[in-house]
A protein has these predicted regions:
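Short, well-ordered beta-strand micro-motif
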Residues: 35, 43, 152-154
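Binuclear metal-dependent hydrolase catalytic cores centered on His/Asp/Glu-rich metal-binding motifs
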Residues: 37-79, 98-107
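Active-site environment of divalent metal-dependent phosphoester hydrolases
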Residues: 13-20, 49-54, 89-93, 115-137, ...
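Proline-aspartate-enriched helix->loop->beta-strand connector
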Residues: 5, 80, 105-122
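Active-site-proximal beta-strand elements of phosphoester/diester hydrolases
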Residues: 38-47, 82-86, 143-148
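Contiguous, function-dense segments enriched for cysteine-driven chemistry
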Residues: 93-100, 108-109, 117
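Core catalytic region of metal-dependent phosphoesterases/phosphodiesterases
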Residues: 1-36, 110-111, 134, 139-150
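Short acidic, glycine-rich surface-loop motifs adjacent to enzyme active sites
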Residues: 75-94
């Protein structure tokens, strides 16, 4: 990586190559919970879609199964600090049919109350309204941040 900090990632809808050849010096947290310096970080990759040839396109039902499995892992410890996903939660910056969020992520918001939700997939220049253009959304106690391109966030 370019900065002296760890890099955690999840798969996006075009990341088939990362699955075959993971980037060096990075840690994939897709479908797992990582503890880093006292922070509990969970990751879920993929986006809305139903292309059976693309493992990173998921229906709402398939993602809901992944959320439930992740919540089983989270129940064994304290609350979630950071949620990292490729797609947003439904209603958080949605635009086209392909660029929709998952409703089941709201279950994670309710049950596990992440302080921060970092996501990508949505291109901010294609959205209307100040929240969407800035890419920062407040969903109850959770701050959801569109990290498309890049973001520097101090924790």
């Amino acid at each position: 990586t370019m900065i002296p900090a760890p890099l955690f990632y999840v798969y996006g809808n075009h990341d088939g190559n990362y699955a075959r050849n993971p980037p060096l010096g990075c840690q994939c947290i897709d479908g797992t919970v990582a503890d880093f310096m006292g922070l509990r970080i969970a990751g879920l990759g993929g986006c809305m879609g139903d292309d059976p040839t693309n493992p990173f396109q998921l229906t709402e039902e398939r993602m809901e199964k992944r959320v439930k499995k992740l919540q089983g892992d989270l129940r064994r410890g304290r609350k979630l600090d950071i949620l990292v996903t490729h797609a947003p939660a439904a209603g958080v910056g949605d635009s086209t049919a392909f660029h929709q969020g998952f409703q089941c992520f709201h279950q994670l918001y309710r049950d596990n109350v992440p302080t921060l939700h970092l996501f990508g997939h949505l291109h901010r220049q294609n959205h209307h309204g100040p929240e969407a253009r800035q890419g920062v959304f407040q969903v109850g106690p959770t701050k959801a941040v569109n990290c498309t391109g890049y973001r520097i966030i101090e924790i």
